[in-house]
UniProtKB/Swiss-Prot annotation:
This is Pyridoxal kinase PdxY. It comes from the Bacteria. One of its GO terms (biological process) is pyridoxal 5'-phosphate salvage. GO terms for molecular function: ATP binding; magnesium ion binding; pyridoxal kinase activity. SUPFAM superfamilies: Ribokinase-like (SSF53613). It catalyses: pyridoxal + ATP = pyridoxal 5'-phosphate + ADP + H(+). Substrate binds at S9, M44, Q45, D221. Keywords: ATP-binding, Kinase, Magnesium, Nucleotide-binding, Transferase. Its cofactor is Mg(2+). Belongs to the pyridoxine kinase family. PdxY subfamily. Its EC number is 2.7.1.35.
Length: 287
């Protein structure tokens, strides 16, 4: 069984960060080692919360503890999400380097949370660090539309521009870019676009866009988690993308139908593993 070290925020109540990522990856047959960068009572969109961030040095100490018992060599991948400070971002880099030094076959997938995530905004300097440092280290990245623009340093309005932006990042090191949400001026307003790009291929997929009165938090974290889990299970990029598109839709639809604010992960767990509605992905020739 594959093992992934997941470095993200955590909420006790609800689903955001690791609270949105751990269970879906486990449901897909992957062992998850959660390292929580932030421990909160709930996500901040509620307007009231309690909690704090973990000290960056403690992040490295925790991973050193795993290494001390000889288990770090069994880590197959690292997934990072919300990093609250430049110090946490630097610690994440050192952790990835340690994992890769211990297991040269391990890979790193970066969800570059640069904006407000669940109401949490990173400290000044995090965005600049992510843009400057993480693409050279990552084997894959999962930006949303805004984050893709920041990573590529350009405005993006079409699929063609998005593919070109992804390829510019791939030239820095990552082998795959998953765009979790792509705004395309040519797409219908009631569709949610996702895109995945490699050096030589690109696929786009669409699912229905639901009009929530309050949009649930954690959808992006869920998206990255499912994609990583499917890749760890041996899926091709396209197969992992199509499964992710279908499974995330199933969770979002279950949440919408139940009129909930928090993602219905447990209720939709069978759909995460075996989605009943598939949307497929088609090759985009945009260069």
């Amino acid at each position: 069984m594959k093992n992934v070290l997941s470095i993200q925020s955590h909420v006790i109540y609800g689903h955001a960060g690791n609270s949105a990522a751990v269970f879906p990856m486990q449901r897909l047959g992957v062992n998850v080692w959660p390292l929580n960068t932030v421990q909160l009572s709930n996500h901040m969109q509620y307007g009231h919360w309690a909690g704090s961030a973990i000290d960056a040095a403690k992040m490295e100490q925790l991973v050193d503890g795993i290494a001390a018992i000889g288990a770090l060599k069994r880590c197959d991948a690292v997934l990072s999400g919300f990093l609250g400070s430049p110090a946490q971002a630097r610690a994440a880099v050192e952790i990835v380097r340690t994992v890769k030094a211990t297991n040269p076959n391990a890979w790193y997938f970066c969800d570059p949370a640069m904006g407000q995530t669940g109401g949490i905004r990173p400290e000044p300097g995090v965005e600049e660090f992510i843009v400057a440092e993480l693409p050279e280290l990552a084997d894959g990245m999962a930006p949303n539309h805004s984050e893709l623009q920041k990573l590529a340093g350009q405005r993006i309005e079409t699929v063609a521009e998005a593919v070109a932006a992804c390829r510019s990042i791939i030239r820095r090191s990552p082998q795959v870019i998953l765009v979790k949400h792509l705004h395309d001026r040519n797409s219908p307003a009631d569709r949610f676009n996702m895109l995945v790009v490699t050096e030589t291929e690109a696929w786009i997929g669409q699912r229905p866009l639901y009009a929530f009165p309050r949009h649930p938090v954690g959808v992006g974290d869920l998206t990255s988690a499912i994609f990583v889990a499917r890749r760890l299970r041996g899926d091709s990029v396209r197969a992992a993308f199509e499964h992710t598109l279908a499974a995330v839709h199933a969770v979002v639809k279950a949440t919408y139908d139940a009129r909930r604010y928090e993602l219905e992960l447990v209720a939709a767990q069978d759909e995460i593993a075996r989605p009943s509605e598939w949307f497929g992905a088609w090759v985009t020739g945009a260069d």
